[in-house]
UniProtKB/Swiss-Prot annotation:
Gene designation: tgt
Entry EC number(s): 2.4.2.29
Enzymatic reactions: 7-aminomethyl-7-carbaguanine + guanosine(34) in tRNA = 7-aminomethyl-7-carbaguanosine(34) in tRNA + guanine
Function text: Catalyzes the base-exchange of a guanine (G) residue with the queuine precursor 7-aminomethyl-7-deazaguanine (PreQ1) at position 34 (anticodon wobble position) in tRNAs with GU(N) anticodons (tRNA-Asp, -Asn, -His and -Tyr). Catalysis occurs through a double-displacement mechanism. The nucleophile active site attacks the C1' of nucleotide 34 to detach the guanine base from the RNA, forming a covalent enzyme-RNA intermediate. The proton acceptor active site deprotonates the incoming PreQ1, allowing a nucleophilic attack on the C1' of the ribose to form the product.
Quaternary organization: Homodimer. Within each dimer, one monomer is responsible for RNA recognition and catalysis, while the other monomer binds to the replacement base PreQ1.
Record keywords: Glycosyltransferase, Metal-binding, Queuosine biosynthesis, Transferase, tRNA processing, Zinc
Protein name per UniProt: Queuine tRNA-ribosyltransferase
Enzyme class: transferase
Organism name: Parasynechococcus marenigrum (strain WH8102)
Amino acid sequence: MFGFEISAHCANTAARCGCFHTPHGPVHTPRFMPVGTLATVKGISTDQLARTGAQMVLSNTYHLHLQPGEEIVAAAGGLHGFMGWDGPMLTDSGGFQVFSLGDLNKIDDRGVVFRNPRDGRIIDMTPEHATQIQMALGADVAMAFDQCPPYPATENDVIDACRRTHAWLARCVEAHSRDNQALFGIVQGGCFPHLRRESARAVADFDLPGIAVGGVSVGEPVEEMHRIVRDVTPLLPTHKPRYLMGIGTLREMAVAVANGIDLFDCVLPTRLGRHGTALVGGERWNLRNARFRHDHTPLDPSCPCPTCSGGHTRAYLNHLIRSEELLGLTLLSLHNITHLLRFTTAMSQAIRDGCFSEDFAPWEPDSPAHHTW
């Protein structure tokens, strides 16, 4: 039911392309996953999302538990039936959101007690509870409940977070009983190399269908994130998908793929779209800018997204954004998601063609790799 096949390797880097098989279809890697936190990629219908080339979509356990509740989602046949998406799905455990968004009352080895920001009620979230919620949501992949330490954090605090993460992973494994759902573990360790290595080995020992690297893009310097990926990835099983959580910029994805990462997720493309910004050729264009007001050319003539292929011009998008029309935000979000998906697809093709190290590793904003995607 679940499996990961590697079809090509880069001769000069650790980059590889492959296919992660799930009950709802294949995920060709390397691959960016759009984020649909509340069972929707903001402002985009599932039909529109399918036209971007998206294969796997991410939703969030924390937010869906608070609204509408996993019971309602389960009654609709799980997330797939609830949102009308028939492709693969992944649910984050909500651990990051509990620690970053929740009003924490207590954290101990048992779990986390926090106050619901919506109605003030107290919620007791344990690894078992997080796993039960994800089984009810029914995504193809569930993430283990972990403790993501902030940046910066003391070494002792990160040691405690790693210890809890590994103990909680064992409890998630024990609680997980859904055969048609894969459970992934998460590597933590902050910016301490020895703790990252210890966590990578500890999580790998559970022999789960896939492994994620978490605790990055939380405020650390980007060079530190690159070092974490370089240190951790060689310690992970080669025959399983590797997922770098919360990353969605072109350079960071290219660096990660060069080090053997397969999957990514990030809210960046839709967040930028909602603020009137388009991703074009490695740049960020503010479509509110007056220079687009009389520009009647497509946003990106080479882009097959519904926005560009649909004949929507820069001038029209400028008008929509300036007028605060919701359609403008949708069109830019569709384009931005397609842009990141095209980029990961181009990396996959470059690996197969034997030119990844020339085109993408290391990738820089003025790289000649631009013409390949």
